[in-house]
Regions:
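Segments that shape or occlude catalytic/ligand-binding pockets
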Residues: 167-206, 231-272
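Exposed beta-strand-loop-beta-strand "reactive/processing" segments of non-cytosolic proteins
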Residues: 2-5, 9, 13-17, 107-141, ...
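Charge-rich, low-complexity terminal tails
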Residues: 143-157, 225-240
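Surface-exposed beta-strand edges and their flanking turn/coil or helix-capping segments
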Residues: 52-53, 143, 209, 239-243
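Generic low-polarity alpha-helical segments
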Residues: 27, 36-38, 168, 216, ...
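Preferential activation on post-signal-peptide N-terminal prodomains/segments
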Residues: 1-160
Length: 272
C-alpha cells in the first residue's frame, strides 16, 4: 500500500479526507458522479472522495472510449480483498526492444569511482567493494542484475512504514536514472520488502528478473539490500501476434489448487 501523502506529492494534489490513509487501488466512477475511491485491500478500507476537476466533456468522451469487455471485481480471498477477473479475457501482445544498462552505472552512483573500490570475481559474478563504508555491489550476468548491499553498523531500520518507503525511494533516487515506466508494485513484511516493476499499458512486466525491476529489503538490524534489473524497455516495435486469451481468476486458482500449490504460498494474482 502507498500513503496518500505520496499521491499528493506526486500529483500536486491535496486529498481532504480528514485523516491520513494508505491505498493500493484508485477507482474512478465512470457514471459522471465525480466520485473516486481509494481502496486499501490489506485493511479492507475504502475512502470516498469527490473529484472536482473532471467535469469536462473531453474527459467523459475519453472515458466512453475505454474498453468494457474486460470486467474486474473485488472479492475477499485469504482474509484480504483481491482484484479478480471473473471471466476469461484477451490481451494484445506488445513488442519492445530491450536495452541493458551498464552495471558500472550503478557502481558509480551507489559506491563511488572505481579507483576507490576493490574488484573481485566470484565465479561469473563481479563484486565491487568499498571497504570504508561496508558497501558492495555484485553484478550477476546470469540474471542480468546488480545487487547493492549496505551493512554499515550505523544503519537503523525505520520504525514507521512511511519512513521505510522514504528510505527505499531515496535509495532509488541516488541512481538518477529515467524510471518513467517503473511503478510501485508491492510491499511485504511491513515495508521491509518493497518491489517495483516496469509497467506497459497498465500491466506489470515480469521478465526482468526474479524480483522485478527493483527489489529492496531492509533487515531488522538496519542492513539494506537492493537488487536492480539491468533490462529496461526500449522503443516499441510492430507485433503481428494474435491476442493472448487469459483464463479467469477463479480458473487460475483452481489450477493452482489442483497442482498442489497452497494458498499460503502466494499473496495475490495479477496478469502481466
Amino acid at each position: 500500500v502507498v500513503p496518500v501523502t505520496y499521491f499528493n506529492t506526486r500529483y500536486g494534489k491535496t486529498i481532504n479526507s480528514g485523516k491520513p490513509f494508505n491505498f493500493n487501488y484508485f477507482v474512478l466512477a465512470l457514471d459522471q458522479s465525480n466520485k473516486g475511491y481509494f481502496i486499501n485491500t490489506n485493511a479492507n478500507e475504502v475512502t470516498t472522495v469527490n473529484i472536482s476537476q473532471l467535469n469536462t466533456p473531453d474527459v467523459w468522451q475519453m472515458a466512453a472510449k475505454l474498453p468494457t469487455d474486460v470486467g474486474v471485481e473485488f472479492h475477499k480471498y485469504q482474509g484480504r480483498v483481491m482484484l479478480s477477473y471473473p471471466k476469461q479475457f484477451k490481451l494484445p501482445v506488445y513488442s519492445y526492444l530491450v536495452n541493458q544498462r551498464d552495471p558500472k552505472t550503478y557502481v558509480s552512483a551507489l559506491l563511488g569511482t572505481l579507483n576507490q573500490l576493490s574488484v573481485t570475481q566470484e565465479g561469473s559474478k563481479t563484486v565491487y567493494t568499498n571497504k570504508l563504508n561496508n558497501q558492495k555491489i555484485t553484478y550477476d550476468p546470469s540474471w542480468e542484475t546488480v545487487t547493492f548491499e549496505d551493512k554499515n553498523p550505523k544503519n537503523k531500520l525505520p520504525q514507521q512504514y512511511v519512513n521505510r518507503l522514504n528510505l527505499a525511494f531515496s535509495q532509488i533516487n541516488l541512481l538518477q536514472l529515467n524510471l518513467m515506466d517503473t511503478r510501485f508494485y508491492e510491499s511485504q513484511a511491513g515495508g521491509q520488502k518493497i518491489t517495483f516493476r516496469t509497467y506497459v499499458k497498465g500491466f506489470p512486466v515480469y521478465f526482468q528478473s526474479q524480483s522485478g525491476a527493483i527489489h529492496i529489503e531492509l533487515s531488522k538490524n538496519g542492513d539494506q539490500k537492493s537488487t536492480y534489473s539491468l533490462n529496461e524497455i526500449g522503443v516499441p516495435v510492430p507485433s503481428n501476434q494474435a491476442d493472448v486469451q487469459l483464463p479467469s481468476t477463479e480458473t487460475i486458482l483452481k489450477q493452482l489448487h489442483d497442482a498442489g500449490v497452497k494458498s499460503s504460498d502466494y499473496d495475490f494474482i495479477t496478469p502481466g
